[in-house]
Swiss-Prot record:
GO terms for biological process: tRNA pseudouridine synthesis. It catalyses: uridine(38/39/40) in tRNA = pseudouridine(38/39/40) in tRNA. This is tRNA pseudouridine synthase A. It is an enzyme of class 5 (isomerase). The lineage of its organism: Bacteria, Bacillati, Actinomycetota, Actinomycetes, Mycobacteriales.
Amino acid sequence: MINGTVRIRLDLAYDGTDFHGWARQGDSDLRTVQKIIEDTLTLVLQRPIDLTVAGRTDAGVHATGQVAHFDVDPAALETRSIAGDPARLIRRLARLMPDDVRIHNMSFVPAEFDARFSALRRHYVYRVTTHPRGALPTRARDTAHWPRSVDISAMQAAADALIGMHDFAAFCKYREGASTIRDLQEFTWHDVSTPQEPQLYEAHVTADAFCWSMVRSLVGACLVVGEGKRADGFTEHLLGETKRSSSIPVAAACGLSLVGVDYPSDDQLGARAEQARAYRTHDELPSL
């Protein structure tokens, strides 16, 4: 219990195509994922609901493994139609929410759980095709098109140079007061072509956290290396930059999906949240 409330975790998915991103835009009527879910929860529970999310996805970005949490007076869950059961609440919400958002699980979690700060790492997948005709019609909403052919080996070499804890300022849009030091744990390129979907690639990207537009910038940097526009060593050189680099294209939002978020065991939730809230400095970077 937190000041007489209980904490509930949501596991959810959405097609980001028709949303202006995750975050509610103040009092604006812009359609965002947060606004849709908060407004629906508020309607059903008859309490104001504020969501905290693991990853604030941009406009057009999708999620299959997004995580959020909210706190609520347990009395709000005791109506006849819910009876204290989160599964019943999911069913109530499903009847009211649009088809491009789905909550697939709800559960009570400890007060120490924080969807954002307790997360150990976030996993993203980026789908892109270089086929002249673009993506299959059935995958056009979650697959980006790159207009030139690429060398996947060159892209993987560019990705490998970025693994580890670095200052990714060159890959991040500026946000006042935000650190750009991140621990990039996985960045692998895969040729997932099929006869129906030739020239199709996926980038699997994992880090403890990502700054604003970082994943799409990482992908864009590799794509320009893969097409031969930038030379070997391009991405490694960018790690020395101290501000956003204009030489990096930001890959299209439609190809990106947040596919998972990892959390520690319950007894480690508070410690992880405290660690994640600490502002990282260059003193923490490994010696070269």
